[in-house]
């Protein structure tokens, strides 16, 4: 019972936050339609997760979160996807027209694979964007490895994402 109340409270808070956080075309370098395309693209490639550490459309469970893939609805999964995507957009907001592309990539590989950490340097992709170099196709596509191996389906996903969301 307590868990249901917490989940309901979280959903109410998230929906209020999402309503305020929904991209407005006037102050962001992309449209609502593009944002919805990103959501649809991620849903298509991620599918519905029911693994131990991931739920919904690829939401990685954080410490203290207790979502269950068995009881989660599609609407709850959609909400988590949008919140995660908005969090990524906030992290990459200073990259302007590239924020959407970087956010889509970060949803799959994690933001710090791109931004770097104290132990990991910034990605070559991000360094090129910061220098104004628009020739980033190969660097974007290079994020197609899993356990050191290139995965054709991930490479295809990167190509689709790049074609849909790269702004010249």
Predicted regions: what they are:
Residues 4-10:
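Sec-dependent signal peptide recognition
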Residues 99-113:
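Short N-proximal segments of mature Sec-exported proteins
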Residues 3-4, 18:
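Post-cleavage N-terminal segment of exported redox proteins
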Residues 1-2, 30:
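Short, Lys/Arg-rich N-terminal segment immediately upstream of the first membrane anchor
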